[in-house]
């Protein structure tokens, strides 16, 4: 893989467009919200937000991007069920 914000191929991490500290765990496991980022972009540049925004709109389109942002504003209403977590566990074999 490669970093979605700078193209680096080493020290990749799960970069969250909407940071985990800003939301419930819902966004931690949202597959649109999580993309490969290198340590520099994810941590040192605090997500490299401008480049990440351009990536998100380019890959998923403005409608999906806007939906994700809107969900973040109402995240207190979104609480994943245990079955959602179990489905992800099975999918990723963790």
Describe the residue ranges of each PLM region.
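Histidine-centered nuclease catalytic patch
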Residues: 4-34
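Short Cys/His-centered divalent metal-binding micro-motifs
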Residues: 11, 33-60
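Short flanking/linker segments adjacent to small metal-binding domains or redox-active Cys/His motifs
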Residues: 65-94
